[in-house]
Amino acid sequence: MLNDLKIEELLDKVDSRYGLVVATAKRARQINEYTATLGLNESLGIPGPQVHTRSQHPLTIAIEELRAGKLKVGFREPAREAAEPAGEAPEEQQRAAGEREDQGAA
């Protein structure tokens, strides 16, 4: 089924090649975890394969799910607060650095 696959078909569903790789790899890990914990899946909340396929390879299953429209891909922007160092805001850090320089010059 993947022999006739063209990457352009999948890029219509994802923003970039990088996004395609990340999304299918993450889903393949989920499918792998699903098969490793067969029987406990309901309690763990791990979804099984969403398409009927002859393949047993998690990455192939993930690509087929994306191709069938069963895999929704979205990326979240990192929170601005998480990008800044914990504690002081940038203005406070600059002010503190200036005070340290003043103390060193005295």
Swiss-Prot record:
Keywords on record: DNA-directed RNA polymerase, Nucleotidyltransferase, Transcription, Transferase
EC number(s) recorded for this UniProt protein: 2.7.7.6
GO CC entries: DNA-directed RNA polymerase complex
GO biological process: DNA-templated transcription
Gene3D superfamilies: 3.90.940.10
SMART domains: RNA_pol_Rpb6
Pfam families: RNA_pol_Rpb6
GO molecular function, one term: DNA binding
Region named Disordered: 76-106
Catalytic activity as recorded in UniProt: RNA(n) + a ribonucleoside 5'-triphosphate = RNA(n+1) + diphosphate
Function summary: Promotes RNA polymerase assembly. Latches the N- and C-terminal regions of the beta' subunit thereby facilitating its interaction with the beta and alpha subunits.
Stated family: Belongs to the RNA polymerase subunit omega family.
Record text on subunit structure and interactions: The RNAP catalytic core consists of 2 alpha, 1 beta, 1 beta' and 1 omega subunit. When a sigma factor is associated with the core the holoenzyme is formed, which can initiate transcription.
The name this protein goes by in its record: DNA-directed RNA polymerase subunit omega
Organism (species): Rubrobacter xylanophilus (strain DSM 9941 / JCM 11954 / NBRC 16129 / PRD-1)
Lineage: Bacteria, Bacillati, Actinomycetota, Rubrobacteria, Rubrobacterales
